[in-house]
Every structure is written in structure tokens, then in C-alpha cells.
Regions:
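Glycine/small-residue-rich loop that forms an oxyanion/phosphate-binding "nest" at active or ligand-binding sites
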Residues: 91-114
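Boundary-proximal intrinsically disordered activation/regulatory segments immediately upstream
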Residues: 19-77, 164-165
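Acidic/glycine-rich phosphate/pyrophosphate-binding loops and surrounding catalytic core
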Residues: 106-126, 157, 164
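RNA substrate-binding interface of SAM-dependent RNA methyltransferases
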Residues: 124-179
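Short, aromatic/basic amphipathic alpha-helical patches
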Residues: 78-88
Length: 179
């Protein structure tokens, strides 16, 4: 099962142990699927991100530690060097049907990654800057859109009440694309 062609690519991949081609076990698949639920995202302190733009943005931001990356062979081939510079996390190459099993999307993107949640800052310092306070925004898509728009306006501090959707919900993460 050869992912990359040519002696230079093969040698580089072997030297850096960048990817591994493997079938996901049932247990591992269930574990990733469990991260779709808030209870397990909180328990494991992890969340998932899907799609090339979101995954690369999160890797480049270096705000969240990447734990696992799952990608189709074509994505691995085109992003080997860039990803290896951003993270030491190996990329697991999966086939279409495996990505469909673990994806929240009806048409999965080429890559999905598991990241550690950020630390919540409970100390509210509002002096000299705009802080956005959200109360009972229950729709994940709306919350993600609000976060993306707030980022565009330069708002860096957002406080969500208990009644808001989970900010690590896959739909929220998807809706914040680019911010």
C-alpha cells in the first residue's frame, strides 16, 4: 500500500515517520465518534475539526495541541511537508469509507483532526477592550457564525453563558472556519 511515489518521498516519509496507513479499529472508530457528544468531549478534553482549512488554521494557530490526524491519501501527498513543520503528530491515512464513519458531515472533507480543548480563562479582564457576552445561543451554527464575525471585528474575548451551545461542538467549530 504505497501512498507516495518516488525514492525521495518514500525516504523522507520513512525518516520523519509522518504517516501510517492503517485500518481504524472498531474501538478507535467508536472513540472518535464519541467526541461528537459533549459528555465525551468534556471527559477526554478533546474536540474534532473537519476539513483542510479548519485543520490547517488550528495547526498554524498553535493554540490547540493536535492529538491525531486522519486524512485521505491525496491530502497526505499534498500536505506532507507543511503539516510536519506544524506538528509532530503523525497522520493516519484512511480510506473514504473510514472517514465517512467518523465524520459528522454527509460529504466528508479530506481530513479530520482531534485537538485538545483550550484552557478556559475564568478571570474576566474587560479593561480597555471589547468583550462579547452571549446568553442562550443554542444553535451551534449561529454560535460559530457569531464567533467568526467577532473575530473579523477584532473581538478576542467571548463569554458564553451556561445556556449556550458547546463551543467545541463540531458544528460550532465548522462554522468558525477562517477565524
Amino acid at each position: 500500500f504505497q501512498m507516495l511515489e518516488g525514492p525521495v518521498c518514500t525516504e523522507w516519509v520513512n525518516r520523519h515517520k509522518f504517516y501510517k496507513a492503517t485500518m481504524l479499529s472498531k474501538t478507535h472508530t467508536k472513540y472518535i465518534q464519541s467526541l461528537l457528544h459533549k459528555k465525551f468531549r468534556d471527559e477526554y478534553n478533546l474536540f474534532i475539526a473537519e476539513g483542510p482549512k479548519i485543520v490547517m488554521d488550528l495547526l498554524e494557530s498553535r493554540k490547540f495541541a493536535c492529538k491525531e490526524i486522519f486524512a485521505l491519501p491525496g491530502w497526505v501527498t499534498g500536505n506532507t511537508k507543511r503539516v510536519s513543520i506544524l506538528t509532530k503528530t503523525p497522520v493516519t491515512t484512511v480510506v473514504d469509507f473510514e472517514l465517512e464513519k467518523i465524520s459528522t458531515l454527509t460529504t466528508p472533507h479530506h481530513v479530520m483532526a482531534v485537538f485538545e480543548k483550550g484552557k478556559e480563562d475564568t478571570a474576566i479582564k474587560t479593561t480597555g477592550k471589547i468583550t462579547l457576552v452571549l446568553d442562550t445561543i443554542q444553535d451551534p451554527g449561529n454560535l460559530g457564525t457569531i464567533i467568526r464575525i467577532a473575530d473579523w471585528f477584532g473581538i478576542t474575548d467571548i463569554i458564553c453563558s451556561e445556556g449556550c451551545a458547546d463551543m467545541y461542538n463540531p458544528k460550532v467549530v465548522q462554522s468558525t472556519m477562517g477565524s
